[in-house]
Structures are given as structure tokens and as C-alpha cells.
């Protein structure tokens, strides 16, 4: 009931939710009548592990859809092994290090997870995943195997790292390294697949590792900030000591009411660190040349900037995991279909952060400088406010955005058609209710 009330008190979000549910047509709707029983089961497993990821994966271009789906399930299997505290390190560590070798087998499964582990079926039915994995193009298989190898070994290293297990992450460099293994590698693999499918230039993968690394780190750092209370309850922490030690002697002390102000300043410092990836994120999105891949990459990023704005200055983060409204999610999904829409979303939330920034915040100046730097970068993208007669500077990002804008124009007719249908339906509803009201009188 609360979510319904939220929608009706935010009309733009209500409109977006109705459009998304009833009017928007996917670019490449999946055909469930095609494919093997194994493939159908893989998509069922995907739906069970993550409905949100399943929704965006299902709308990918057919060239990439199965590859990305299997990539996700394989990494989910790896993560399910790593997360299960009931598995002995003597079993877990070698399994993580050798997990990529399992991809060479025709059949293999693992039934060693706790019965309460929600995603254990992915491992129990791993032979089903293998059957479809071996149908992928060899180059796609190689990308997935390489990332699985790197991620599995990274996970194993952290399990054996006594310093990490005792005191968490010490430095910002440690923080970046951890985020690389759990999210940066995903950006690496996805970008490699997108490049092999010819949905981006080869340079996006081979020449721009900082861009796809930032795509992963921006998402992971946002989640780490948001999940402070949840992680603390689980007896773990990922906020780096190099940042939190400025505000407390003990990370857990932020959860005490008397330390809420210090905790908020620490949150804002972490937000400042995450904002350092935004320029790379926008540059990456401007480099994509296929619409479904663009939407697949853009949606999580706009959710992340919205979440960063939500956690900024928000002491509730110290007590519970906060989430953006469902209606906001619907609005962002529709708005982020164009690159310009994504940029406008980032601009909106950056303004929101700056508006709520207080002079008392220790990072007041640094946050203002970072946001001003991003404002300037966004101006450079479009250069649409130049004096009469002035020519735009042909910078690399300006040229990227100009090329990307051609793809945005292809999306506009779809948006206009949805708006037309919505207005027609709204007119019909008003007419019907008006007639009923007149008749009742």
C-alpha cells in the first residue's frame, strides 16, 4: 500500500510506471518458444537469482543475450560459493581458484552449499548452464572463462588475507582493488563481449581500461556506502579505514545516535570518492553504438547516481539499507534510453547533492570542486551555450557525444509514440469518468 501512495504523490513517477508496464515495447523481445529445454531452464534460474538483472538481460540484442545471461549465472555461481560461510576454506579456496576449469567439462555440479543458500540451485544445476555455455561462440566462452579465473582467484586471495578478515580494508587503494575484483572485472568482461559483438569500437576495450573499470567501481562503491548497516550486522565492513578513521576510532560507532553527524560526514566523504568515477562513466556510455547494450549499461549507472544522492547526508544509512522509490526506478529506466537523458539525470542528482551540502561538512570545498569539474565536463560534451559565431572545440568527448546523438534520434520516435498512446488513454479515461459523473448526477 505504501508504494501505491508513493506513486500517487509523485505524478511523474506514476506516469513512468504506467508507461513502463503497459506501453513500452522492448527492443528485442525474447521468444520463449525458441531454444532448448536447457536454455529455458537457464533463463528460469536467471529470473530466480535476480529479477532486475533478468529484465534488462532479456531485452539485449540476440547476439549478446545468451552470452551475458550465462556470464551472469556463472559469476553468480562463483559468488554463491564465496558467500557461503558453511563451506570450509579447505574446500572453498581450491574450488574458487579452479572454477574456470569446470567450464571445460560437459557436466559438473556442486551440492555443498547450505540448504538455506538462496542461489544454491545455480550450482546444483550447473550442468544445465554448461550445456548452453558450450554453444556460445568460442571467443565469448574465452572471455567468460578468463574473467571467471581472475575473479575466482581474487576471491580466494581475500579469504586467505588475515589482515582483511581481521580489520577490513585499510587504504583507498585496497578499496579500489577489492572493488576491481568484485565489479571492475565484470565491466572488463562485458566490454570485451560488447566489442567482440561489434557494438563498440575496439578502442573502448583495448585503449580504455579506466572507463570500464570505473563502470564497475562506481556501482560497487555506491552499494558499499548504502549497505553499511547490513554489512555491519553480518560482521563485515568494506568502508576503507583511510576514510572512516577521519571521523571515528571504530567503524561500528557510527551506528550510535551520538555519532550520527560524524557518520554522515564519512558517508559524504565516500560519496566524494565515488563521484571521481562519473567522468569515465559518461565517457563510456557515449562510446556505445548499439541501443540495447547502451540501455543495459546505462540503467545501473543512473540508478547508482540516484542512490548516491539518496545516501548523501542521510543518517538513515547508518541504521538501515535505503533504496530509491520504485516509481523513481521506472522514471530512470525510461529517461536513460538516450545519452542526453542519462546526462540530464546525472546533472539533476549532482545539483541535488550540491544543494544539500552544508558549509560545516569537512569536504565542503572538495565536493563543490568535484561537482564543478563534472559540470564543466558536461558543458564540453554539448557546447550548446556558445556565443553567437563561436565554434565548438572539437574535443574527443564532444565528437563522441555528437556521434552518439545520432543513436538518440532513433529512440525519439518510440518515446513520442508512447507519449501519444498515454495521452490517448488518459483522454479516454477522463471522458469515461466524466460521463459517469454526469450520468450519476
Swiss-Prot record:
Lipid bilayer topology: Multi-pass membrane protein
Any one GO molecular-function label of the UniProt entry: squalene synthase [NAD(P)H] activity
Transmembrane segments: 293-313, 420-440
Family recorded in the similarity comment: Belongs to the phytoene/squalene synthase family.
Highest taxon in the source lineage: Eukaryota
Keyword 4Fe-4S recorded: no
Compartment(s) where it occurs, according to its Swiss-Prot or TrEMBL record: Endoplasmic reticulum membrane
Upper taxonomic lineage: Eukaryota, Fungi, Dikarya, Ascomycota, Saccharomycotina
Gene that this polypeptide is encoded by: ERG9
GO CC aspect terms: endoplasmic reticulum membrane
InterPro entries according to UniProt: Isoprenoid_synthase_dom_sf, Squ/phyt_synthse, Squal_synth-like, Squalene/phytoene_synthase_CS, Trans_IPPS_euk-type, Trans_IPPS_HH
Entry protein name: Squalene synthase
Main EC class the enzyme belongs to: transferase
UniProt-listed GO biological process terms: ergosterol biosynthetic process; farnesyl diphosphate metabolic process; isoprenoid biosynthetic process via mevalonate
Involved pathway(s): Terpene metabolism; lanosterol biosynthesis; lanosterol from farnesyl diphosphate: step 1/3
Job of this protein: Catalyzes the condensation of 2 two farnesyl pyrophosphate moieties to form squalene. It is the first committed enzyme of the sterol biosynthesis pathway. Required for the biosynthesis of ergosterol.
Amino acid at each position: 500500500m505504501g508504494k501505491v501512495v508513493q506513486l500517487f504523490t509523485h505524478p511523474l513517477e506514476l506516469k513512468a510506471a504506467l508507461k513502463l508496464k503497459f506501453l513500452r515495447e522492448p527492443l528485442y523481445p525474447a521468444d520463449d518458444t525458441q531454444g532448448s529445454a536447457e536454455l529455458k531452464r537457464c533463463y528460469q534460474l536467471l529470473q530466480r537469482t535476480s529479477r532486475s538483472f533478468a529484465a534488462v538481460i532479456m531485452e539485449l540484442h540476440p547476439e549478446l543475450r545468451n552470452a551475458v545471461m550465462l556470464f551472469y549465472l556463472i559469476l553468480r555461481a562463483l559468488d554463491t560459493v564465496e558467500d557461503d560461510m558453511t563451506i570450509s576454506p579447505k574446500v572453498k579456496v581450491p574450488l574458487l581458484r579452479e572454477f574456470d576449469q569446470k567450464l571445460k567439462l560437459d557436466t559438473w555440479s556442486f551440492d555443498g552449499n547450505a540448504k538455506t543458500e538462496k542461489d544454491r540451485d545455480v550450482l546444483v544445476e550447473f550442468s544445465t548452464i554448461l550445456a548452453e555455455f558450450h554453444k556460445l561462440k568460442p571467443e565469448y566462452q574465452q572471455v567468460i572463462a578468463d574473467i571467471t579465473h581472475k575473479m575466482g582467484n581474487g576471491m580466494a586471495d581475500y579469504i586467505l588475507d588475515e589482515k582483511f578478515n581481521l580489520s577490513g580494508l585499510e587504504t583507498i587503494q585496497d578499496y579500489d582493488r577489492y572493488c576491481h575484483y568484485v565489479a571492475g572485472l565484470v565491466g572488463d568482461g562485458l566490454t570485451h563481449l560488447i566489442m567482440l559483438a561489434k557494438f563498440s569500437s575496439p578502442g573502448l576495450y583495448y585503449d580504455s581500461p579506466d572507463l570500464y573499470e570505473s563502470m564497475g567501481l562506481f556501482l560497487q562503491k555506491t552499494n558499499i556506502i548504502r549497505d553499511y548497516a547490513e554489512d555491519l550486522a553480518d560482521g563485515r565492513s568494506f568502508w576503507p579505514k583511510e576514510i572512516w578513521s577521519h571521523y571515528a576510532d571504530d567503524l561500528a560507532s557510527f551506528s550510535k545516535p551520538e555519532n550520527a553527524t560524524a557518520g554522515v560526514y564519512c558517508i559524504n566523504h565516500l560519496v566524494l570518492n565515488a563521484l571521481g568515477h562519473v567522468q569515465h562513466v559518461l565517457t563510456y556510455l557515449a562510446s556505445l553504438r548499439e541501443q540495447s547494450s547502451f540501455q543495459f549499461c546505462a540503467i545501473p549507472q543512473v540508478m547508482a547516481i540516484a542512490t548516491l544522492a539518496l545516501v548523501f547526508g542521510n543518517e538513515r544509512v547508518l541504521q538501515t539499507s535505503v533504496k530509491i522509490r520504485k516509481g523513481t526506478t521506472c522514471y530512470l529506466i525510461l529517461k536513460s534510453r538516450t545519452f542526453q537523458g542519462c546526462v540530464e539525470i546525472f546533472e539533476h542528482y549532482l545539483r541535488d547533492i550540491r544543494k544539500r551540502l552544508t558549509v560545516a561538512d569537512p569536504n565542503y570545498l572538495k565536493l563543490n570542486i568535484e561537482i564543478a569539474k563534472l559540470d564543466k565536463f558536461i558543458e564540453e560534451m554539448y557546447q550548446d551555450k556558445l556565443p553567437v559565431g563561436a565554434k565548438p572545440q572539437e574535443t574527443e568527448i564532444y565528437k563522441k557525444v555528437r556521434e552518439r546523438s545520432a543513436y538518440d534520434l532513433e529512440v525519439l520516435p518510440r518515446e513520442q509514440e508512447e507519449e501519444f498512446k498515454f495521452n490517448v488513454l488518459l483522454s479516454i479515461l477522463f471522458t469515461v469518468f466524466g460521463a459517469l459523473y454526469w450520468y450519476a448526477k
